[in-house]
Amino acid sequence: MTWGFLKQGIFRERSRVGKQKFYHCVSRYFHYLPPVLAILLPVGSWPFLSEQQWRYSYFLFPVVSSLGWLFAIGLRERQLRAAAGQLLETKIRKLTERDEGLKNIRETIEKRQKEANRLKLHNDKLVERLGQAREVVIQAKGRYDHMEEKSRKLHEENKQLQMQLEAAVRERNEKILENQELRQELKETLAYQQELHDEYQATFVEQHNMLDKRQAYIGNLEAKVQDLMCELRNLLQLEVGAKTELPGRPMASRDVVAQLVLEFRKIVFRVETTEAADSLTALRYTRTDPSAHNYSLACRQLFDDLREENLGMLFIYAPFAQRVLFANALFKDWTGHGLEDFLNKEGDVVLEGFAQWERDLLTESRTERSGKIVIKTKAFGATPFYYCVVTLDKGPLAEHVLGVLYPAKASFFTNLSYI
């Protein structure tokens, strides 16, 4: 490191000597520059001056030239003084060279001068190093202050984290206590539910035994109901056979509609009575029979009963689906058409009264609706028919329409006997 500083000092000394030589050369000839500029400036600007400016130039140019010459003379005096000092120093050196004592003193002075220069150079190096050390100290102090500030912030963050940790620990302890309380409540709830389950299980077994007893009782009643149903059907059939005329025998033309409505009500009552009787049977309480099977069985039994009726052209119609569910064989026998043809507005089966006929079929009223329509039969042409319809109120075909059609003329059966 010492050799590096020494090389750096030598380089700086050489640079200083070179600069002194350059400045000495420049200062030697610099005193010629101001007078030359003082002379050339007015001469060079003379062609560019106006006539009015020429008047002032006679006064301006001598002043400028005088100032330039005064400046040059001052520089020259300083150079002469410097040259006199150098000449005096040279003479002193020559005198000291002749005298041995003065020569020794001079050498001593030169050595001390060199030592002073060396010390000065060393001092400059020390000052420079001191400046560098001061910069390092300042930087270290800045870093120390930065670290101190950072340490303070970290300390504050540590306090905040410690407070958060304590809050989290307290919350955790509270959650643990709450969890223990919830577990205790859950155990008590489970115990209570187990007691309820045992109680419900005992109640279910008791109710199941009671249902088995009632099922056995209902099974005993079923046989009695079936016997009563058979007797009721026999009585109804006897009543119908006594009061209802066969299709081959014409009704009285004066009260055909009233008698048709009366007989139709009996059929409706018989259907509803059948449904009520079926609802009392054990099939309603049997857990093994599905409801769809019971529904289809009840409908099939109802259709079989309606096929045995000979009041007229009986049918069952679903208004919400606009679909025919049942129609007996008299439709084909008397008219040669199916019930679907009677409901077709675009067809030519219903010649008169179609609007009222359609309105009565789609009406949701529970009362009987009756009327008259003219039908184009395949065998006899246009033939009037009375009709009576009603919306069923209960049973498997509730909300469906039950209806009957009957010829309005007694001659229809006379003509039918010839076919």
From Swiss-Prot:
What InterPro entries would the database entry show? Answer: UPF0242_N, UPF0242_PAS
Task: Kindly name one Pfam family recorded for this protein.
Answer: PAS_12
What is the similarity comment for this entry?
Belongs to the UPF0242 family.
Tell me the protein's name: UPF0242 protein TC_0906
Q: Which organism is it from?
A: Chlamydia muridarum (strain MoPn / Nigg)
Q: Taxonomic classification, please?
A: Bacteria, Pseudomonadati, Chlamydiota, Chlamydiia, Chlamydiales
